[in-house]
């Protein structure tokens, strides 16, 4: 659950990801929304 919350979940498609990080990008779940979390995750990945 923590891995999912922090966007570290491995994925092959968006449906493998959780609500807070619903988009699969380069094999990892990331946030698709605007704001601090999305910006940080987007910057790292």
UniProtKB/Swiss-Prot annotation:
Q: Does the UniProt entry include the keyword Chaperone?
A: no
Q: InterPro entries in the record, alphabetically?
A: Omega_atracotoxin_CS2, Toxin_23
Q: Tell me where on the tree of life, at the top rank, the source sits.
A: Eukaryota
Q: Chief subcellular site?
A: secreted
Q: What are the record keywords, sorted?
A: Calcium channel impairing toxin, Disulfide bond, Ion channel impairing toxin, Knottin, Neurotoxin, Secreted, Toxin, Voltage-gated calcium channel impairing toxin
Q: Which SUPFAM superfamilies match?
A: omega toxin-like
Secreted listed as a keyword: yes
State the protein's purpose.
Potent inhibitor of insect (bee brain), but not mammalian (rat trigeminal neurons), voltage-gated calcium channels (Cav). In vivo, injection into lone star ticks (Amblyomma americanum) induces curling of all eight legs into closed loops, followed by death.
Gene3D superfamilies with a match to the protein in the record: 4.10.40.10
Domains: entry comment: The presence of a 'disulfide through disulfide knot' structurally defines this protein as a knottin.
Q: Name one GO molecular function term.
A: calcium channel inhibitor activity
Q: Where in the cell is it found?
A: Secreted
Query: What single Pfam family name could you report for this chain, choosing any that match?
Result: Toxin_23
Q: In which tissues is it expressed?
A: Expressed by the venom gland.
**What family is this protein classified in?**
Belongs to the neurotoxin 15 family. 02 (omega-actx) subfamily.
Q: What is this protein called?
A: Omega-hexatoxin-Hv2a
State a GO cellular component annotated for this protein: extracellular region
Q: Give all cystine bridges in this chain.
A: 4-18, 11-24, 17-29
């Amino acid at each position: 659950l923590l891995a999912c919350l922090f966007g570290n979940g491995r994925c092959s498609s968006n449906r493998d990801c959780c609500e807070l990080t619903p988009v699969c990008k380069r094999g990892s779940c990331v946030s698709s929304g605007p704001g601090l979390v999305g910006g940080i995750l987007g910057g790292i990945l």
